[in-house]
Amino acid sequence: DGCFESHATQPRATLIDRCTGGFMRFRQGGDYNQMPNHLADLTLWNFNAKNNVADSPFIWWDNNSLWWKFLPPIVVGYHGGSIHFDESQMKLNEEQGNTVTPYSLYEAQLRKRLGAVPAWLNSLQ
């Protein structure tokens, strides 16, 4: 199963919006001199996990590893599989186990900015 990848020095602000897939540790990359894997603006919104990490609790910043470093993320509507997050390492963990509305944060932001979701985007659904 695939999962999101976050390679060191590159990710600064990422919205993973209503995606379905795996959620596994150590699928990230980057030289240890270029950590963290992600800076402060990682948001997972309505993530439907099909393959969860067995680690409990799931940590975002591993002091015992050179290669697993995420600044505290925002996670809203994580569902599909059972996982226990270390909430002390998160900005926000809301509605875990449930889908939330708006279903797509990206589309809701477009609606607010543009007044509507563009037709080309609606045609992809």
What are these regions (language model features)?
Residues 1-125:
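Extracellular parallel beta-helix/beta-solenoid repeat domains
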